């Protein structure tokens, strides 16, 4: 297996201060072709990445492939979750990295790490990820915030990007590596973000909130009532 590229022997992990997020071609039409994961999960994961990038003040760049055609518009949740996101219109290029304005926007962030997700995985995520590695970036590909037309296509693409030096991750791992600690003022917002990725986590949040309320309000336990 190939080693992660451009890390110079260092541990390949996300540095929030040196990272930019590229959310590529998360479009309503393309989402209808996704078969390797539930569309609702893909949509939630992509939106969660945008939310966490906003919390961590990570630059976000979005783009779409011929959005006036059958590929459809970007899903609106991404820019709603990341109002600071910059949209770059392409001129038909399939690989976003072939668009000079897109690459210029990435370079303008001054960041050396790129967190990339895109639909479809084998094209919209893989092509720019491999190209960015070639240009010297440290690239993290978020596989479960990217979707494609078959499980086989996902597996082949994962092997290809790893061979090229890309670091594959899932959404929860990306969020955790960005968050780093629960000892931060926005910890509650991060917890809410996780609940969108794995909804059962919301049950833990609710149980904890109730337990805290019992303590803080000096509620009498049912077992103590006469």
Locations of regions flagged by a protein language model:
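Distinct, well-ordered alpha-helical segments
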Residues: 71-78, 102-103, 128-130
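Glycine-rich phosphate-binding loop signature in dinucleotide/nucleotide-binding domains
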Residues: 106-112
